[in-house]
Regions:
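Hydrophobic membrane-insertion alpha-helices, especially the h-region
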Residues: 9-24
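Ser/Thr/Pro/Gly-rich low-complexity linker/stalk segments immediately outside membranes or between
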Residues: 27-41
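Periplasmic-binding protein-like
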Residues: 40, 93-102, 121-125
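Extracytoplasmic "Venus flytrap"
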Residues: 40-56, 70-82, 87, 101-103
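Extracytoplasmic/secreted envelope proteins and their assembly/folding machinery
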Residues: 55, 59, 82-85, 108-112, ...
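A short, Lys/Arg-enriched amphipathic alpha-helix followed by its capping loop at the start of a domain
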Residues: 57-67
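Flexible loop/hinge segments that line or gate small-molecule binding clefts
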Residues: 103-128
Length: 128
């Protein structure tokens, strides 16, 4: 019985060491850049192939530069999209890419103005 406990303990210690080694190597091999650009993207719907392709192309560039892309789908709900913009502000993104569900929504306009006032660049796509 004691032999089984010793083996289990050794296996546990071995797994813990491998985990720590993996974490260490990750941080040594993957360059950390505290100046990574954070981008928030919200399109009126991700059910449209156009927005999927657009987002995939943006994501490729973001990954190449080791930056961060947060993509959200409001599913044609302007209130949800407004909440997403407010979340991007809280996350302190550098850029918001938006295809507005309702470009005339006062709540959405207010949230986007707040983003702009905090220094976030706002890029509107596929809208008049």
């Amino acid at each position: 019985m004691k032999k089984g406990k010793h083996i289990a303990l050794l296996v546990s210690v071995f797994i813990a060491l491998l985990t720590m080694l993996g974490i260490y190597l990750h941080y040594k091999l993957v360059p950390y850049n505290e100046n990574r650009v954070k981008i928030g993207a919200t399109y009126m719907t991700m059910n449209n192939d156009f927005y999927k392709v657009l987002n995939n192309e943006i994501d490729k560039i973001v990954e190449e530069k080791n930056d961060i892309l947060y993509t959200r789908d409001p599913a044609l709900d302007v209130n949800k999209q407004t909440q997403q913009v407010e979340l991007f502000i809280k996350k302190r993104v550098d850029i918001i890419i938006i295809n507005p569900v309702d470009a005339d929504s006062k709540k959405l306009i207010k949230a986007l103005k707040k983003a702009k006032e905090t220094g976030i660049k706002v890029v509107v796509v596929d809208s008049q």
